[in-house]
């Protein structure tokens, strides 16, 4: 086999008949497969051992030569070469055809390649190929035209008239002769000449023909190779035949298709030998043509060939296509050895970098390692005995297993793998039972729960794989989410509940006002029952000398609760004391108001600050902020410890708290019935107005809905006022552990209006709540909404998954390729607004980006941040506080790195908080970051209740798809094509339109917009090109024609951000930029100048510039082109890699086109390297990492730590507790 790591690129081309014969190890002459009695392959058949190699390793068919020592010998009795049976996966045969046949891909594809080369329409071509008409090949001196079609009757007539003075044939033979006659150079020359004058349809056809002929000319493929003399037979192990129980056989469909070809071919040979009448021969040739068509692409023309049960047979094309095809099933995703799967279960005792692996599973996964160790230790005498010991599960193997797994991490994966955090590495810990145990904080990243979810486990085998798992994939490293740089390991449920309860404050608890000299003293008091967690106490700052205290209070006494004191023990010793859940307290010392002034009584101080303490227990959102802050100051290791401690404390506290829910925790509302009766009266009034014809049906419906919503809100507000903050349900909702006020309303107030299946609302509300119980009708109405919720979720998951697939495909080859591309361009960013609503603040757009020019204070003119500096949070705050509204930053959109991005234009890697490394696969990360939250977006298109003007706006997932697929948006806005002033807005009642006139410096433009459209401008306003004249969504295709690429990219960026942020999903700009850039990578050539580019050709902007550079250097006229926007699907198919495009969609079309052009795949992206089995060119697969040599390092660096180090620290910590 060839070593895939040895070659640089991969080329595809058309195979000539001689090439097909050179691949072959012999001709398949008979349709037989295997002998029914001996079950051995038949001679000259489809499984012949002489052609394809032996079925048994190192043994010929007759058994004369057996064993490796005879390797390479060809048996003189049976003619089989003695070799490994693996060759039956790679050796090909061929069928020598009695008549040539055309290849259906090139004749039937759109556009028909054969038709374009010969300049014959596909319909006429079909008549010739399938023997319905003759075609004139050489008219001689007759008055016939070349390539003229003749029916059977016409042909006879002409034959009688002219005899042999002309030549006309039918079938593939005729096509081959015509293709041989095509003079490519001459045709190309003529077409280029024609293009100078041609217009309209003629020009389009000429460009298409020129494109194909030029491709043949440049690739070295010959047009006549589209017609085949010999058909290759693929290796037998790729179309196997296996015996089932009961003696029957199951076979691949390909064998049936090959048999049809061989049978028809043999019959045709016999007919030709017998000199059969022409009509019979022609019929047989047509049948042979159809058999080969079915073999190559069954069902492409006419009715497909069917097998038993009317099932269409799977042809060679079907073996490549779709999810079950070769590309996606076997090349991009393989089943792997050393893996298992099981149900997952929670284990709160694990450390953050550990997972529990069931003993039997671990034994099976690490079997070879255990066997090796058993032999090494002398417990077993050889490998066979070791295996036997393991199968018997002897007692002495478990200790060995414990030692074997110590330094070997395992990978855990949960499907669906939506982003890179769905596969993480853990240190295995042996556990009893059969379920895999997961750390509770790892659930968020996996989106896992324990209601029956399953996970797959994989063992990294090589030393490199183990090292990468430990250093790059260990769960303890994955604290921040790559999509927005915020912590993904946020505590939830019990942990949140426990810490919230722990940090609550209560007046009048036992021991209030006691002052302690140290936390240890307070703990003793708590254990003696003198104080409670919620007791407000005084604490000496001297007890925590390393903490930063406010100036002048370093030795003072501050007010806190014992619970908060316990919580603060989790933080590092030199971190601030946190008393209130604010960003200020996380980044600055404790507020001085909590400290006793000299001579002040503690009780008066408690009265002063008690309200602040009572109002500030630590909620879920604050815990998340605290994780981010600890990560910012102390990095991975300390954050990992903090998370584990937070989990421990949360579980302990929620157990101690004893919080439960009972029926009596749901409060009663006194005047609910009156409120409902009042609403009913209002509804009656509205119905009366409708009956009298004062309002329309739509208005009546809208008013009824708003009356009931108002009634529900009123009840909800009352519940919010009467429920006590110590109510267990309130504690759960307020802390963020589970539920919200709406759940409370449904339990205690009323359920309100229910959704109808078509997305509207029922007018009859559910006035009962769950405590009272629902009536039968109310329950029935509720079921519609519940069912709609379920179906919507299922649909959304599928939509979102497909979006992710397209995004990954278009961006997979975007990798950080160098340090700095040296560009002086950038984009100017400001806050994204929607009317008065802030969508994305400037601060979010600056953090982690490099400045493109110095940022100056708008008032003083002083430099705040220099040029080419990566802005961290502090710098971004400074810029925003100084009142700067626009900042020019380095951007992916303006990066000049070919086939990727440079570090400076990308900025910070959000998952680590550091500058991005060369080799980071930022394209895939961007696609995952946008696709993964797709399931959280709505599927709805909002309808505006019949208000004239404002169009229905598309939001959520459909809007994101609309943008990335560059579709014509719903409710399209009209945009101005010129810079100028709005001259007039006139109504045209006859046409039901308005006429908006824009007066520019050079010309004046008028736009006719519908009456219903909301006009966004007034007379006298100044508008720029691309500005909206009416409200709605701009069509990016229109925008790019009126403005430039950058404006279009910025528009798409802002719109995608709106769609996500309106649903409360934060995604960093850079991810959207990566994908937007991919959509605008291509240009369409308008005038080729003196280059060899064809007019109308779509090409990469980088290639276009390179070609122009060459022409300008040699003094020629450069080509001109226009930027175009491609949808992500189209962009993925237009990529330079045919392997990546073929494995995405439209496999046969991509391969047809690539082979005619003789395309060369440079193997730059990830997919194409995975397909051929080469190491991917990202991360440690980059050439700079591959060529590294290990060196002995004398000094141990501080930054790299091992699991053993952490364990040591944890043990020391446990001792001190």
UniProtKB/Swiss-Prot annotation:
GO (cellular component) term, any one: DNA-directed RNA polymerase complex
InterPro entries according to UniProt: DNA-dir_RpoC_beta_prime (IPR045867), DNA-dir_RpoC_beta_prime_bact (IPR012754), RNA_pol_asu (IPR000722), RNA_pol_N (IPR006592), RNA_pol_Rpb1_1 (IPR007080), RNA_pol_Rpb1_3 (IPR007066), RNA_pol_Rpb1_3_sf (IPR042102), RNA_pol_Rpb1_4 (IPR007083)
Cofactor binding remark: Binds 1 Mg(2+) ion per subunit. Binds 2 Zn(2+) ions per subunit.
MF GO annotations: DNA binding; DNA-directed RNA polymerase activity; magnesium ion binding; zinc ion binding
Signal peptide stretch: none
CDD domains assigned to the protein according to its UniProt record, in alphabetical order: RNAP_beta'_C, RNAP_beta'_N
Residues involved in Zn(2+) 1 binding: 60, 62, 75, 78
Entry keyword annotation includes DNA-binding: no
Keywords for this protein: DNA-directed RNA polymerase, Magnesium, Metal-binding, Nucleotidyltransferase, Transcription, Transferase, Zinc
Reaction(s) this enzyme catalyzes, per UniProt: RNA(n) + a ribonucleoside 5'-triphosphate = RNA(n+1) + diphosphate
Binding site for Mg(2+): 449, 451, 453
Pfam family, one: RNA_pol_Rpb1_1
Enzyme Commission number(s) of this protein: 2.7.7.6
List of residues binding Zn(2+) 2: 821, 895, 902, 905
GO biological process: DNA-templated transcription
Cofactor(s) the protein needs: Mg(2+); Zn(2+)
Subunit record text: The RNAP catalytic core consists of 2 alpha, 1 beta, 1 beta' and 1 omega subunit. When a sigma factor is associated with the core the holoenzyme is formed, which can initiate transcription.
HAMAP family xref list: RNApol_bact_RpoC (MF_01322)
Protein task: DNA-dependent RNA polymerase catalyzes the transcription of DNA into RNA using the four ribonucleoside triphosphates as substrates.
Family: Belongs to the RNA polymerase beta' chain family.
Name listed for the protein in its UniProt record: DNA-directed RNA polymerase subunit beta'
């Amino acid at each position: 086999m060839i070593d895939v790591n040895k070659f640089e690129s991969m080329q595809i081309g058309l195979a000539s008949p001689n090439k097909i014969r050179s691949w072959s190890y012999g001709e398949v002459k008979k349709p037989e497969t295997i002998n029914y009695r001996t079950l051995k392959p038949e001679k000259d058949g489809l499984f012949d051992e002489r052609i394809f190699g032996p079925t048994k390793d190192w043994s010929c068919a007759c058994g004369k030569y057996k064993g490796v020592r005879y390797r390479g010998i060809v048996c003189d009795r049976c003619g089989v070469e003695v070799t490994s049976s693996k060759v039956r996966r790679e050796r090909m045969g061929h069928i020598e055809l009695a008549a040539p046949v055309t290849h259906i891909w090139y004749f039937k594809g759109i556009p028909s390649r054969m038709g374009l080369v010969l300049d014959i329409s596909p319909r006429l071509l079909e008549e010739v190929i399938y023997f319905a008409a003759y075609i004139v090949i050489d008219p001689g001196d007759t008055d016939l035209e070349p390539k003229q079609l003749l029916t059977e009757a016409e042909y006879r007539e002409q034959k009688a008239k002219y005899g042999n003075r002309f030549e006309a044939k039918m079938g593939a033979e005729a096509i081959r002769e015509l293709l041989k006659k095509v003079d490519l150079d001459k045709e190309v020359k003529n077409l280029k000449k024609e293009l100078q004058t041609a217009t309209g349809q003629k020009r389009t056809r000429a460009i298409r023909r020129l494109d194909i002929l030029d491709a043949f000319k440049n690739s070295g493929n010959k047009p006549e190779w589209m017609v085949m003399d010999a058909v290759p037979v693929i290796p037998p192990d790729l179309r196997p035949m296996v015996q089932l129980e009961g003696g029957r056989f199951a076979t691949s469909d390909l064998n049936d298709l090959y048999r049809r070809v061989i049978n028809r071919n043999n019959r045709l040979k016999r007919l030709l030998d017998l000199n059969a009448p022409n009509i019979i021969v022609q019929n047989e040739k047509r049948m042979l043509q159809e058999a080969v068509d079915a073999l190559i692409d069954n069902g492409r023309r006419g009715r497909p060939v069917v097998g038993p049960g009317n099932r269409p047979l799977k042809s060679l094309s079907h073996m490549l296509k779709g999810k079950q095809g070769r590309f996606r099933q076997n090349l991009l995703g393989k089943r792997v050895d050393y893996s298992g799967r099981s149900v997952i279960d929670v284990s709160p005792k694990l450390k953050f970098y550990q997972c529990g692996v069931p003993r039997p599973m671990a034994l099976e996964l690490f079997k070879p390692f255990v066997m090796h160790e058993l032999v090494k230790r002398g417990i077993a005498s050889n490998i066979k005995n070791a295996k036997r010991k393991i199968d018997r599960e002897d007692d002495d193997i478990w200790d060995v297993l414990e030692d074997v797994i110590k330094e070997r991490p395992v990978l855990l994966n949960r499907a669906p793998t939506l982003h890179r955090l769905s596969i993480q590495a853990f240190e295995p810990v042996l556990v009893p039972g059969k379920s895999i145990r997961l750390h509770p904080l790892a659930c968020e990243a996996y989106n896992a729960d324990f209601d029956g979810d399953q996970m797959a486990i994989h063992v990294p085998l090589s030393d490199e794989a183990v090292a990468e798992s430990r250093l790059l994939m260990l769960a303890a490293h994955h604290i921040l989410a790559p999509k927005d740089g915020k912590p993904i390991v946020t505590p939830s449920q019990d942990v949140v509940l426990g810490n919230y309860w722990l940090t609550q404050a209560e007046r009048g608890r036992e021991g209030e006002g006691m002052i302690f000299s140290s936390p240890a003293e307070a703990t003793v008091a708590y254990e003696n029952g003198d104080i409670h967690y919620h007791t407000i106490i005084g604490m000496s700052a001297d007890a925590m000398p390393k903490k930063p205290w406010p100036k002048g209070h370093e030795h003072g006494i501050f007010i806190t609760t014992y619970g908060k004191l316990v919580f603060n023990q989790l933080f590092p010793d030199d971190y601030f004391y946190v008393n209130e859940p604010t960003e200020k307290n996380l980044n600055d010392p404790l507020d001085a108001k909590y400290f006793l002034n000299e001579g002040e009584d503690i009780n008066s101080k408690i009265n002063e600050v008690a309200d602040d303490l009572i109002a500030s227990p630590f909620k879920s959102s604050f815990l998340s902020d605290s994780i981010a802050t600890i990560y910012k100051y102390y990095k991975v290791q300390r954050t990992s410890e903090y998370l584990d401690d937070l989990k421990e404390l949360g579980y302990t506290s929620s157990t101690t708290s004893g919080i439960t829910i009972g029926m009596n925790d749901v409060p009663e509302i006194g005047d609910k019935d009156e409120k409902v009766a009042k609403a009913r009266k209002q509804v009656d009034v509205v119905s009366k107005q409708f009956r009298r014809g004062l309002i329309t049906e739509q208005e009546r419906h809208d008013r009824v809905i708003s009356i009931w919503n108002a009634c529900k809100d009123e009840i909800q507000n009352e519940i919010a006022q009467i429920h006590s903050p110590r109510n267990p349900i309130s504690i759960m909702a307020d802390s963020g552990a589970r539920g919200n006020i709406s759940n409370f309303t449904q339990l205690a107030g009323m359920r309100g209006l229910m959704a109808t299946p078509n997305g509207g609302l029922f007018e009859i509300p559910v006035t009962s709540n769950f405590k009272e119980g629902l009536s039968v009708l109310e329950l029935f109405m509720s079921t519609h909404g519940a069912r709609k919720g379920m179906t919507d979720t299922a649909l959304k998951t599928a939509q979102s998954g497909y979006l992710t697939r397209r995004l990954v495909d278009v961006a997979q080859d975007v990798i950080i390729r160098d340090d700095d591309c040296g560009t002086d361009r950038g984009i100017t960013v400001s806050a994204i607004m929607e009317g008065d609503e802030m969508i994305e603040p400037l601060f979010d757009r600056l953090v982690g980006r490099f400045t493109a020019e110095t940022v100056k204070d708008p008032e003083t003119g002083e430099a705040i941040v220099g040029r080419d500096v990566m802005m961290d949070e502090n710098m971004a705050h400074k810029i925003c506080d100084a009142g700067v509204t626009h900042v020019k930053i380095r951007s992916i959109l303006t990066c000049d790195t070919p086939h990727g991005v440079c570090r400076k234009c990308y900025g910070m890697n959000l998952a680590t908080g550091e500058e991005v490394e060369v080799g980071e696969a930022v394209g895939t990360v961007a696609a995952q970051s946008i696709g993964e939250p797709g399931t959280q977006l709505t599927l709805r298109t909002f309808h505006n209740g019949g208000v004239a003007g404002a169009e229905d706006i598309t939001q959520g997932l459909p809007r994101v798809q609309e943008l990335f697929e560059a579709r014509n948006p719903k409710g399209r806005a009209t945009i101005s094509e010129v810079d100028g002033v709005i001259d007039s807005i006139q109504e045209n009642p006859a046409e039901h339109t308005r006429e908006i006139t824009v007066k520019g410096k050079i010309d004046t433009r008028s736009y006719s917009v519908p009456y219903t459209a909301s006009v966004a401008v007034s007379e006298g306003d100044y508008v720029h090109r691309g500005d909206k004249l009416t409200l709605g969504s701009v069509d990016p295709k229109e925008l790019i024609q009126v403005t430039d690429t950058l404006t279009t990219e910025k528009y798409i960026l802002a719109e995608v951000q709106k769609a996500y942020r309106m649903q409360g999903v934060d995604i960093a700009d850079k991810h959207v930029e990566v994908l937007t850039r991919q959509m605008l990578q291509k240009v369409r050539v308008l005038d080729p100048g003196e280059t060899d580019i064809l007019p109308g050709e779509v090409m990469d902007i980088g290639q276009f510039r390179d070609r122009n550079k060459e022409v300008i250097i040699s003094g020629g006229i450069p080509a001109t082109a226009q930027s175009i926007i491609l949808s992500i699907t189209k962009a993925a198919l237009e990529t330079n890699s045919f392997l990546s495009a073929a494995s995405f969609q439209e496999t046969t079309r991509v391969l047809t086109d690539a082979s005619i052009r003789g395309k060369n795949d440079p193997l730059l992206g990830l997919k194409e390297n995975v397909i051929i089995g080469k190491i991917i060119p990202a991360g440690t697969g980059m050439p700079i990492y591959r060529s590294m040599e290990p060196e002995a390092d004398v000094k141990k660096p501080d930054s790299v730590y091992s699991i053993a180090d952490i364990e040591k620290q944890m043990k020391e910590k446990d001792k001190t507790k």
